């Protein structure tokens, strides 16, 4: 709710009006049935937003994976933004961030047992996933597909950044909205993301009123929780110290940090690290940035200028996917590179309610699942 954070380019309003008219007509064609949305025979959950930029879609998708994977055969379908491939690609052990995109690759490496694919055409992608015989897909999670209306999801989850609520924003290019605020009405769940842990009750009430949701829509608030630093190159790290696998943030006291990010909003990570050390240099690139040879050289030079006896390079999990296969990253740097994991926490003691909302939808719309089979066996 930091309104100073929101930058509106008013001189671009005329272009935004034209863009808005085109998007509105497109949405109306779907609403009126002139353009058809396709439903599928399995639960399809869409996670998306109204704006461009980071609202935390990947961490929230990972939350759903962890919630569902033990009882259902889950598949994740993403567009694979900025990948160096086209069409439908099923993730394999040989996949890289270049072949499927950095965020899909991140999820694939963290959850290798979960089926993951990328396809610009989400209908085609779902059809391909459902044609897989083993395992037979029971739930599809659509990553960043809120505007892809050719698919009709059974449950739509809309994310909005606490610091840039969609009700405070305006359409591209003057603002960052992909479509008008009315698009929120397609969501059954709205989550205000990136909330401070100590958010006040009055802020909950203010945001609830400002979002102006319908009775059929459930509102939740979430926050980021940062885990222990993970070595990006564990084998390189073990050559120096075989006992070091991960580092708690509390161990960063008296450590010099070079923070390297290529994400939409690195400020929250920087603020988190400042809680443990004030010796931080930051090197920021655009979101989904593919690191060039010059970038790697710049990282090496900036890291070399850190004066402390103990020093590390800290990056995000997403950026780590683009560094891990980089051909010119030197062996001497690898042991010092750590990724900072992010997990989602549902606030207001609403986590159980949120989990049951998701599980209830999947259970009611799943034709066959290990969970349902065990439940039926227990009842008999």
Curated annotation (Swiss-Prot):
EC numbers on record: 2.7.1.130
Pathway listed: Glycolipid biosynthesis; lipid IV(A) biosynthesis; lipid IV(A) from (3R)-3-hydroxytetradecanoyl-[acyl-carrier-protein] and UDP-N-acetyl-alpha-D-glucosamine: step 6/6
Annotated keywords: ATP-binding, Kinase, Lipid A biosynthesis, Lipid biosynthesis, Lipid metabolism, Nucleotide-binding, Transferase
Pfam family of the protein (one): LpxK
Name of the top EC class for this enzyme: transferase
Top-level taxon: Bacteria
Binding-site list for ATP: 51-58
InterPro entries tied to this protein: LpxK (IPR003758), P-loop_NTPase (IPR027417)
Catalytic activity entry: a lipid A disaccharide + ATP = a lipid IVA + ADP + H(+)
A single MF term (Gene Ontology): tetraacyldisaccharide 4'-kinase activity
Transmembrane helix keyword on record: no
Gene Ontology BP terms: lipid A biosynthetic process; lipopolysaccharide core region biosynthetic process
Record GO cellular component, one term: plasma membrane
Similarity comment: Belongs to the LpxK family.
PANTHER family: TETRAACYLDISACCHARIDE 4'-KINASE, TETRAACYLDISACCHARIDE 4'-KINASE, MITOCHONDRIAL-RELATED
Function: Transfers the gamma-phosphate of ATP to the 4'-position of a tetraacyldisaccharide 1-phosphate intermediate (termed DS-1-P) to form tetraacyldisaccharide 1,4'-bis-phosphate (lipid IVA).
NCBIfam families: lpxK
Name listed for the protein in its UniProt record: Tetraacyldisaccharide 4'-kinase
Organism expressing this protein natively: Bacteroides thetaiotaomicron (strain ATCC 29148 / DSM 2079 / JCM 5827 / CCUG 10774 / NCTC 10582 / VPI-5482 / E50)
